[in-house]
């Protein structure tokens, strides 16, 4: 059998358009759709799409289409088998496997070091063919399709990379029965997910994009969002004194929702450890009166004078909210947020519903230590720590908040802007505002870690959830989220030319009152760097573009804005020498 790939031309296009797959193979797009997409791609970037007819011994048997972008920065964007089909009358004759071998040879001869494709996870027949050809799942789900990759040079080892990041290596995910991670990224165009490891330590329970994780303190912005929906309806006043609603816990007012949400009311109880899943239910009053495993709520700092993170303050706010509205937070969130955004797997499920528990992650080794059937804790403090969700749905919420901030939507624009405006220490109403244009919150429940961040300038959001909680892994998974966010942010930005970058290079003055300042900007290996001087010494960071005159600092939440012969960093302007 001789397989030949022939470019689509006037002589074969009609025959290719007549090809089709079986009715039980709905995974493959019709060839006319594929060719139309090829025309659109090539109109924008000539040569990107390469459609071919597949011949076996000079007999037309199928169609394929490649995507070539060898100059793309991310290796995953360079070489793709975009479409592949064998006509229904020619299947089960070995043509598919033989054609894949010829396709692999074509890519290898044209300089590709690896080849990607994607297909629906339910496409068992296609996956069997791809696996036989050496393709393996990368762990990424893009637009509901599983991404597979085959190395074309060197050993055919699957590289578990997501946006160029080796997530498994950085989080030490080495076994399919070890700990697991779930990630979602919306990069302005597509929703991509990545899953690896097990949702339940020691068990064959692969993480999937719809698996529920506990979100820890990311519960707080979800409570704030719910409450602000009531503010927009005129049912709650953020600045009204609420001490009369909960007089047993506030002996002296005033206390407002705004102060509680911004952690400036001065209350204790930083966080909550949770209880075994089979623990008897506790009321919010029980928690605040110290009848659980945490001390009684009390004020330990002057009201409104400093930022002091307080899960106890959020629990007090939740109790006040339920007394004012007559509904539980679970009910209010479901109606105001989940139903509005079409969320199916996000809510204050305490305890977790049995129908949801079948696809829920366990936290750390709680199943081994406490309850084999329920490897997670019960959190009666819903607003502070009680949310269950998925990264995909966290991204949907982040995008809705970003849109609200930019133009209004789920919240009125002015309400969203107040939510994101720092009161003290970068913390607004339930959420941090980092760098002036990033909404951020992380979470830590027993056995669970979460990092969630979204842009206030554009449609970009990242969520990372992990079923293990240690100090080391906390910062590691946070930096994975930061790296993913900054990679997507850089991809969305206008790319400055080398001439423009070189014009920014040089030494900058050191203002006398500066705790930290830019000392020098320079080029290295075609990339822009800045050296900073501060009270703790000097350090160097790579810069990346986020706007026409603005650059972010890799690995950190700060930005540099260049003007005429000056640079502004942390609101401090340094003149170029």
Regions found by a protein language model. Name each.
Residues 117-127, 143-145:
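Conserved beta-strand-loop-alpha-helix junction that forms the acyl-donor binding cleft
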Residues 175-182, 202-260, 299-312, 382-385, ...:
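Short active-site loop at a secondary-structure junction
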